[in-house]
Amino acid sequence: LVEECTVNWAIVRTIIVYGVVDNMSRSNLVLWAKSALQKGETINVINDQFRAPTLAEDLAEGCMLIADKKAKGIYNISGRDTYSILDLVYQIADFWQLNKSLIQVVSSTTLNQPAKRPPRTGFILDKAINQLGYKPKSFREGLNIIDKQLKGFEK
C-alpha cells in the first residue's frame, strides 16, 4: 500500500536503540546494565540472542539523511556489527570497569518475555550506506559518546 502512494515516503527499520536523553521515560540496554552493575546488583543476561545495537545519534542521522535527500523506500538504520546480548553487556562492563562477576548468564527461555524474539537480528546496511552516506559508529564509539553525555548531565 505504501509503495503505491504518490507522496514521498520512507520507512526506517532499526534495532535495539541505546543512548542518553534528559528525563528518559524508559532505559535501554546500555544504561540499564551500567546502572545495575555500578550499584553492585546481579543481572541476568541472555547468551542466545544477537542484535546490532543502534546509537540514538546514528538513528537520528539516518532519518536526517533520508529527509535531506528526499529518499524514498525502506531503509535499515542500525549499528554495523551484530553481537550477543551477553557480549554487549560484557563490553559495557569493560568500558566502565565494572564487576563482570555480577553478570549471570541465562538462556532466553528462562525469561518471561511478553513476545517471542528472533535469535538473531541484524541488517544489511548497504542501501543506507551507498544511497544516503550513512556511517554508523562502532559500539565502542557509541559508549564513548554516552560517557561524555553522562558526564555532561552530572554537571
What are these regions (language model features)?
Residues 57-65, 140, 144:
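Amphipathic alpha-helical segments that line or abut small-molecule/effector binding pockets
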Residues 3-51, 58:
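NAD(P)-dependent short-chain dehydrogenase/reductase
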